[in-house]
């Protein structure tokens, strides 16, 4: 006859009990950055979730950090907020130490690398992207892993729906698997910069499609556009279900 495990049985008392606190969570959402010839775009949806619950329908994921540098750290929202605040403080201290000299985008990338690497034993659980203009006035997008490894890219998506959006960006921005008509797939289309209008349309299409397929993305879309004249913001509604 099978023994029923209870609080008094040996089977129950021998079962290991897990006493563990998980300090991390995933609050959903998606971000993406695209670099243009003389501009850069960073976008993110505004949904904040825990499991199947929506915590907020407006939780911004993209931030203007000054000096024509915009930033997003998506994943665990508390870690993302902490990293953005630390970087904004770094920008202020750079101004104090260098007589209000502007921080360049490549120096910003190196600074964020140090912030992330310094926390490598208890990392910020985020995918980080920054965007801005380089010394030549060209758009620049840098993406980071949680411990500080980074690279400059033409475009990058991160977060819940990155696996849905990135193949679309590879095709439409990096022109992967695109060939000149009439060449039977032998002559690749040359890379070219897209206009601001084309990029914003791609961003909106990317997020509109992602909201149809991923429950962690939706509600609103914030887009920050960086040009030599500064940073401007655009907002568009997304699906709320």
Curated annotation (Swiss-Prot):
Gene3D superfamilies associated with the record: Glutamine Phosphoribosylpyrophosphate, subunit 1, domain 1
Subcellular location: Cytoplasm; Nucleus
Subunit and interaction comment: The 26S proteasome consists of a 20S proteasome core and two 19S regulatory subunits. The 20S proteasome core is composed of 28 subunits that are arranged in four stacked rings, resulting in a barrel-shaped structure. The two end rings are each formed by seven alpha subunits, and the two central rings are each formed by seven beta subunits. The catalytic chamber with the active sites is on the inside of the barrel.
InterPro entries documented for this protein: Ntn_hydrolases_N (IPR029055), Proteasome_bsu_CS (IPR016050), Proteasome_sua/b (IPR001353), Proteasome_suB-type (IPR023333)
Protein name: Proteasome subunit beta type-6
Record carries keyword Ribonucleoprotein: no
Function, as annotated: Non-catalytic component of the proteasome which degrades poly-ubiquitinated proteins in the cytoplasm and in the nucleus. It is essential for the regulated turnover of proteins and for the removal of misfolded proteins. The proteasome is a multicatalytic proteinase complex that is characterized by its ability to cleave peptides with Arg, Phe, Tyr, Leu, and Glu adjacent to the leaving group at neutral or slightly basic pH. It has an ATP-dependent proteolytic activity.
Gene Ontology terms describing biological process: proteasomal ubiquitin-independent protein catabolic process; proteasome-mediated ubiquitin-dependent protein catabolic process
Family: Belongs to the peptidase T1B family.
Gene that this polypeptide is encoded by: PRE7
